């Protein structure tokens, strides 16, 4: 009677545990540890119920009761769900949650910064690049900068990556004379990007005239597009005659002299490169882009401090977290 009561208690407890476990589909390490601990406790209570073998007598067939069969089924189900379950009870360890949270949050912030800078890039693409170029993390950024959508953005032909992807999807862009259909296609050194002839080419020329040409230009030269190499455009930025009325001559002269000195001092520092970075060669007249060299980290301007050997390694730590996308 005592044995039956104990077994009925085990069965009820096991069914409750199985009901809790079956609600969740994915099993994490913590949940598997809970299963293994429960199995350990069940076994610890079941083993003393088994009859010990007597030495010197013939073996007889064991009579299995219905309750023992139930217990075997429950234990088999637990082993199937758990997979590799530990035979021994797992000991609890003290963990500093503050350290783990700080490490995880810093990595998550870096991932979000990269994602804002390289829009439409998912964690899977970062993982593939990290597996390929593990140890040389600087090459990962070079590969990201060689993409067609990023080169169009760096050259100044496009305002955002979304616009670049739209042009590629609508088949307006050519690479070495062939239509480019994949925005994530990486270019090689010597490849040339051009724009397909059509209505969009004229719209792009009209938009580039407003951006590249200075405001103070004679009318007979407005139809031309200059081939800029590196030209300081600060002197075309200010138009003081529009700000001040003709009566305020003293204010105009004082401000003009002060700004003239300031421009001479900061002429070398403040320069707008119409051609974009050094690893690209651009002709705005023909609307062509060619990749001369592999991009360097010094040529790229990031909104945050870039240490690829430290900052890109967070991708390997985020592999476990499937919810992050």
From Swiss-Prot:
Q: Name one GO molecular function term.
A: rRNA binding
Q: Where is the S4 RNA-binding domain?
A: 146-209
User: What cellular component terms from Gene Ontology apply here?
Assistant: mitochondrion; small ribosomal subunit
Report if keyword Ribonucleoprotein is assigned. Answer: yes
Q: What is its main location?
A: mitochondrion
Q: Example GO biological process term?
A: ribosomal small subunit biogenesis
Instruction: List the SMART domains.
Output: S4 (SM00363)
Looking up PROSITE patterns in the UniProt record yields: RIBOSOMAL_S4, S4
Note the InterPro entries from the entry.
Ribosomal_uS4 (IPR022801), Ribosomal_uS4_CS (IPR018079), S4_RNA-bd (IPR002942), S4_RNA-bd_sf (IPR036986)
Question: Signal peptide location in the record?
Answer: none
Query: Where does it reside?
Result: Mitochondrion
Report the superkingdom from the record: Eukaryota
**Sorted UniProt keywords:** Mitochondrion, Ribonucleoprotein, Ribosomal protein, RNA-binding, rRNA-binding
UniProt keyword Nucleotidyltransferase present = no
What family does this belong to?
Belongs to the universal ribosomal protein uS4 family.
Q: Which PANTHER family match?
A: 30S 40S RIBOSOMAL PROTEIN, SMALL RIBOSOMAL SUBUNIT PROTEIN US4M
Q: What's the protein called, per UniProt?
A: Small ribosomal subunit protein uS4m
Q: Which gene encodes it?
A: mrps4
